C-alpha cells in the first residue's frame, strides 16, 4: 500500500541504515521527518496500521493554522462542517455558557494525518504495523529492533526521534519513565438535527471525582462527544455511558452512538515531565511532555516540537542535535511551565465554580492563553 508515493507497509526488509529514524507517524513525527530529510534519508515507523486513526476531536487552533500556512494549504476536502467553530466554556449544572474568540479549523483527524504523510519528500520511507521493540545507543549512533510481519529487523541511524505518544516506548527505553495519562473516550453520534457551531468544553459535577471534562463538536453528519477521565479511572466506559445520558437529555439531536473510541492523553503535572531527550535520541510531542496541561491541546505542540527536532537534526552534527533541539523548544517548555502554575486552581471545585462569575470577555481573553 502506498500514500503519496511513500512506503506504508512492506513484507520485505527495508533499508538497514538511515540518517534519521522517527518512531510515530502523527503530526510530531511527520514534521520531524519533513525537516530532518534535509540532512539525509529518514525512516518513519508507526506501530499501528496506516492510514493512522487517532482518537481526537480534530480541531486546529490558530497556532496550528499559522504553522501549517508556512508548510502547505490545508485541503478543503478534509474540512468538515461547520468549517470553523469557536471554543465555548460550559458549566453544565448551572446552565452557564461563555463563548470565546478562540477559533478552530474543523478537520477530519484521520484525513489530516494522512495528508501530512503526503507532504513528505521522496527520501522519507513510512512503514506501518512496525512496532519498535527497543534500541541501544553507542558513540556512533542508534540501533533499533523493529518487528514487521512477525520478523524482527535491526535498523541503524545517526539520530532517533521518539514521537510515539503519551505511552512512548522510546521514552521508557531511555529510562526517563512514563508520564501519567488521562483515559479518553469519544462517541461518534449520528446527528438528527443541527448542533450549534461551537467546540463546547463541558464541566459537570454528577460523574464523580474521576471525571475531568467533556467536549462536543459538530463534525459534518456526526456529533463527536468526547470525555476525559483522570488516571486510574475504573470502569471508564460506564462513566461515559452516564455522561452520554446526561448530555443527550438536553441535546436530543445527538442520535445513536455508531462508534466509540478509547485512547489515552498526556497528563502533564510537573516541569520534570518535559524531557527533550538524551544522547542522540530526541523526544517530541507527547513523548517529550509537550502538550498543554490546561486545555489538553496537543496538535500545535506536536507540530512545533517535531519541526524543531527535525530542523536541529538537519542543521547539526548528530552529537549536537539534542542541544540545538533543547534550545529550540525552550520557549515551548516555558509556556507549559507557566500553564502549570494555573492548573491547581483550574482543576479545583472553587476554580470551576468561580469561572461562572467571570465576565465573558475576560473568559475569552484568558482562554487564548490556555
Question: For the regions a protein language model found, what residue spans apply to each?
Answer:
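Extreme N-terminal leader/targeting segments of oxidoreductases
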Residues: 1-20, 39-40
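N-terminal FAD cofactor-binding segment of flavoenzymes
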Residues: 48-88
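N-terminal Rossmann-fold NAD(P) dinucleotide-binding loop
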Residues: 29-30
Amino acid at each position: 500500500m502506498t500514500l503519496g508515493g511513500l512506503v506504508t507497509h512492506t513484507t520485505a526488509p527495508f533499508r538497514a541504515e538511515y540518517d534519521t529514524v522517527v518512531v510515530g507517524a502523527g503530526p510530531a513525527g511527520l514534521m520531524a521527518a519533513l525537516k530532518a530529510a534535509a540532512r539525509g534519508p529518514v525512516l518513519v515507523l508507526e506501530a499501528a496500521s496506516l492510514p493512522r486513526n487517532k482518537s481526537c476531536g480534530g480541531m486546529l487552533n490558530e497556532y496550528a493554522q499559522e504553522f501549517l500556512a508556512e508548510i502547505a494549504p490545508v485541503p478543503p476536502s478534509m474540512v468538515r462542517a461547520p468549517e470553523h467553530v469557536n471554543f465555548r466554556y460550559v458549566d453544565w449544572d448551572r446552565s452557564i455558557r461563555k463563548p470565546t474568540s478562540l477559533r478552530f479549523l474543523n478537520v477530519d483527524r484521520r484525513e489530516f494525518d494522512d495528508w501530512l504523510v503526503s507532504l513528505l519528500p521522496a527520501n522519507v520511507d513510512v512503514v506501518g504495523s512496525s512496532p519498535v521493540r527497543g534500541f541501544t545507543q553507542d558513540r556512533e549512533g542508534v540501533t533499533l529492533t523493529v518487528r514487521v510481519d512477525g520478523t524482527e529487523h535491526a535498523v541503524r541511524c545517526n539520530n532517533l526521534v521518539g514521537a510515539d505518544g503519551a505511552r512512548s516506548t522510546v521514552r521508557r527505553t531511555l529510562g526517563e519513565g512514563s508520564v501519567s495519562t488521562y483515559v479518553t473516550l469519544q462517541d461518534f453520534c449520528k446527528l438528527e438535527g443541527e448542533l450549534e457551531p461551537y467546540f463546547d468544553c463541558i464541566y459537570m459535577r454528577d460523574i464523580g471525582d474521576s471525571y475531568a471534562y467533556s467536549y462536543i463538536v459538530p463534525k459534518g453528519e456526526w456529533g463527536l462527544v468526547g470525555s476525559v477521565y483522570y488516571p486510574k479511572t475504573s470502569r471508564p466506559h460506564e462513566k461515559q455511558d452516564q455522561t452520554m445520558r446526561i448530555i443527550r437529555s438536553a441535546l436530543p439531536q445527538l442520535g445513536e452512538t455508531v462508534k466509540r473510541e478509547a485512547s489515552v492523553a498526556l497528563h502533564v503535572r510537573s516541569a520534570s515531565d518535559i524531557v527533550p531527550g538524551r544522547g542522540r535520541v530526541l523526544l517530541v510531542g507527547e513523548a517529550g511532555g509537550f502538550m498543554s496541561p490546561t486545555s489538553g491541546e496537543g496538535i500545535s505542540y506536536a507540530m512545533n516540537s517535531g519541526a524543531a527536532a527535525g530542523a536541529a537534526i538537519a542543521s547539526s552534527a548528530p552529537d549536537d542535535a539534542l542541544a540545538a533541539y533543547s534550545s529550540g523548544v525552550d520557549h515551548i517548555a516555558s509556556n507549559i511551565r507557566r500553564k502549570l502554575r494555573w492548573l491547581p486552581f483550574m482543576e479545583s471545585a472553587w476554580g470551576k465554580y468561580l469561572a461562572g462569575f467571570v465576565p465573558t470577555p475576560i473568559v475569552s481573553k484568558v482562554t487564548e492563553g490556555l
